[in-house]
């Protein structure tokens, strides 16, 4: 493991902006839909389908290509993926029909999926043990800062001035730069001394589910993704249609959640380096449940800045992602399965949380109202909390384990 602080800082900086670019490309269609939907004559259902197809292909590719990178190396898979999703962002700007967009977004999910499992595995492998949580948390928090806070402003401002096609072209540019930086500066991690050099078999991959923490993380990832997408899809509608607040208030509240997620997404995994993964995950899950519940309290809308402050200090979603989908899985399995473990947790979470949960909530909300979306988001956090109660602690500080990883089934 390369534990040089200088290299760690370089790696973390490059992958921070790369992950931010990935989420910029993933979230851009949600923000640009009001611009391209009328031109391409898209229905609300078709816009939702575009998001779902990307989630499905992302889920499969993050597992498959993560496992492939465990066998052939990280950079051989990551660099082509970064360049391909950047090209596909440009191609989105050339689309002239729903079917064009459907194919392009599906292919983009295939290209972007590997970046999650491979980049987080790179950080985990190249960081000193006492800085793993901090480094993972910082990189993962880029999704909140770029994808949830900066992307809505950047893409809509460009679309308003030069059109939605120009916004997609602009969103694709950073990926080419980050791909070049990864090629030049990122090193292939060295094998650990205790790591087997034999190629894993199919039976070895299936055996990952024998690890208690692994299947618990899959369940927790489903709860986290349900919380994330139920909140982000239905909170804007609830605030404007049920709470009868102007769109500017919705923007203020959602912007506050995005910024809060960035800061807590960095701080909480860093704290887990000191006190352990399990207690921080318990606190993160409990805090995140407050956000959808706060949106249900009418009196808070009389004081919108107070509500913004509440959701700012309680949005620990990115912290949950770092712990549930990266740190705990990779610390629970043998080193040669790190990217595979990340991909497996993400696969289950994307399918049952990111894809299925919004569809179920959307259909039920037609009958029971949009408040159901907030209750379902809170329920997702409750699932994460329950999972955390049964997790085995994976903090592997040298002073705790004599410097040798221990894997418990």
What do these predicted ranges mean?
Residues 104-143:
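Cytoplasmic helix-loop-helix junction between adjacent transmembrane helices
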Residues 184-204, 397-405:
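Flexible cytoplasmic inter-helical loops of multi-pass small-molecule transporters
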Residues 278-328:
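C-terminal transmembrane helical hairpin of 12-TM major facilitator-type secondary transporters
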Residues 60-96, 272-275:
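Conserved MFS/SLC helix-loop-helix module at the cytosolic interface between two early adjacent transmembrane helices
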Residues 29-30, 213-262:
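Extracytoplasmic gate region of multi-pass secondary transporters
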Residues 134-152, 346-356:
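Glycine-rich segments within core transmembrane alpha-helices of 12-TM secondary carriers
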Residues 41, 73, 94-100, 244, ...:
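Helix-breaking motifs and short loop linkers at transmembrane-helix boundaries and internal kinks
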Residues 139-184:
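Helix-loop-helix hairpin linking two adjacent transmembrane segments in secondary transporters
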